[in-house]
A protein has these predicted regions:
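Mixed-charge, Lys/Arg-rich low-complexity intrinsically disordered regions
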Residues: 1-3
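Loop/turn positions that initiate beta-strands
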Residues: 5-8
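Generic structural signal for residues positioned in beta-strands
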Residues: 10, 38, 55, 69-71, ...
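Compact nucleic-acid interaction/catalytic patches
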Residues: 12, 17-63
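C-terminal terminal-subdomain/extension
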Residues: 60-126
């Protein structure tokens, strides 16, 4: 699967206690002329201190097991080629795309969230 908007990936994000843990990440843009894309992670919703911009329910993606939220503060602009290399090496795993409605909520949230970095917002034209 090529690196493109709506693609969902499982990216290594383990902790000291769970080094093999992976979190769902969503690619939020197609590669630009420089081959860059925006990617954002999804994390477990634990309390009301989590970013409320885009809260997801377990039924919104097969990988989600419980209520989650989009971790806009860690949104990044990354090289699509580097991401593709990580996929080909098996470090990053591909999974089912996000449905169109959920993806729209995630993408709109990049501009709405107060936690999205300024450089990501500028890149997206927010």
């Amino acid at each position: 699967m090529p690196v493109k908007e709506k693609a969902a990936l499982l990216v290594p994000s383990g902790t000291y206690h769970e080094p093999d843990k992976k979190h769902l990440h969503i690619i939020c843009s197609d590669p630009d002329a420089k081959g860059l894309v925006v990617i954002v992670g999804i994390s477990t919703y634990t309390n009301d201190l989590c970013d409320q911009t885009c809260v997801l329910q377990a039924h919104e993606h097969p990988w989600l097991r419980h209520q989650s939220f989009v971790l806009y503060r860690k949104a990044e602009i990354v090289s699509a080629a580097a991401l593709q290399a990580r996929i080909q090496s098996g470090e990053v795993l591909e999974c089912d795309e996000v449905n169109a409605q959920t993806f729209l909520r995630i993408k709109k949230g990049l501009c709405k969230s107060p936690q999205t970095k300024r450089k990501v917002k500028r890149y997206l034209g927010c």
